[in-house]
Regions:
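Tandem repeat scaffolds
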Residues: 2, 6-18, 25-171
Length: 171
């Protein structure tokens, strides 16, 4: 047999239990939502895909065929486009900061006003690209790619305020 509960002890125990429950529920409701996992569409054929104005930070497009794809206005910071085929793709007004672009093919690609600051693009192929207003600050490029880009570089990036030719180090 249990001793009878004191009238003073019972309500306090219940109040503490309710308070603990409310605190536990409150912290789960107030906790920040977990970040969405980055999109991974490596080795896909996404010809003509529409990704405009999307948050694609950290996404993986490695070895993906993105011919004629639209990324205009998207945030691709830290994304990996290693070996991606971006012929005639629209990457105008995109954030490509810290993106991996190594071995990607940019042929007829529109990079107008794109920010590529700190992107890795050493073995990237650039032909017939539009780079007016693009910012290539701290982007390692091979000599042949740099020569091609300096031949068409013009404008000032509206986000960073940097001149395209200066960001490439063109003479």
């Amino acid at each position: 047999m249990h001793p009878p509960m004191s009238p003073k002890r019972g309500p306090h125990r219940l109040a503490r239990w309710v308070l603990a429950l409310l605190l536990a529920l409150g912290t789960t409701w107030l906790a920040p939502a977990p970040a969405m996992a980055a999109m991974d569409v490596a080795k896909q054929v996404l010809i003509g895909a529409d990704f405009h104005d999307q948050d694609l930070r950290g996404a993986t497009f490695n070895l993906t065929n993105l011919r004629d794809a639209t990324f205009a206005g998207s945030d691709l910071q830290g994304a990996s486009l290693f070996g991606a085929k971006l012929q005639d793709a629209d990457l105008s007004n995109t954030n490509l900061r810290e993106a991996t672009l190594d071995s990607a093919i940019f042929d007829g690609t529109n990079l107008t006003n794109a920010v590529l600051e700190d992107a890795f693009a050493f073995n990237t192929k650039f032909t017939n690209v539009v780079i007016e207003g693009a910012d290539f600050t701290n982007v390692p490029l091979r000599g042949d790619a740099l020569k091609t880009l300096c031949g068409v570089a013009s404008g000032t990036n509206p986000v960073t305020g940097r001149d395209t030719r200066s960001s490439l180090g063109c003479s």
